[in-house]
């Protein structure tokens, strides 16, 4: 087996996308699928600064999409007007989290919905 670093493709949004090393982490899943002798399709979440969602079909990485979610969360949580003046806490308000999930699925785009957190 030889590992050729990096993958390039189009994500679900149609935008160009790349993997630079994360594909090696998927070797374990591909090996596990092979050991199970399954043709099961798998959808993997690879959380991190740049979260990757990967579709594996018939033992092959078919498509992946990278999101800016981890880095965006870190920057908003550290430097934005959304958190300025609020006390720091590791507590997760599950109701607020659920509301955020519901809001994220509404029309209008991410940025207006983020700003609406200030007015709620």
Feature map (PLM): residue ranges:
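Glycine-rich phosphate-binding loop plus the immediately following alpha-helix
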Residues: 3-38, 47-103, 107
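Conserved beta-strand elements of the Class I
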Residues: 43-45
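Adenine-nucleotide phosphate-binding core of ATP-dependent small-molecule kinases
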Residues: 103-120
């Amino acid at each position: 087996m030889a590992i050729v670093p990096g993958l390039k493709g189009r994500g679900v949004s149609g935008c160009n996308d790349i993997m630079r090393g994360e594909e090696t982490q998927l070797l374990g899943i591909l090996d596990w699928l092979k050991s199970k002798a399954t043709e099961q399709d798998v959808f993997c979440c690879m959380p991190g600064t740049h979260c990757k969602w990967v579709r594996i079909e018939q033992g092959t990485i078919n498509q992946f999409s990278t999101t800016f979610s981890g880095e965006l969360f870190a920057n908003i949580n550290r430097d934005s007007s959304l958190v300025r003046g609020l006390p720091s806490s590791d507590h997760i308000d599950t109701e607020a989290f659920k509301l955020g999930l519901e809001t994220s699925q509404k029309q209008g785009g991410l940025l207006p919905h983020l700003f609406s957190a200030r007015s709620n």
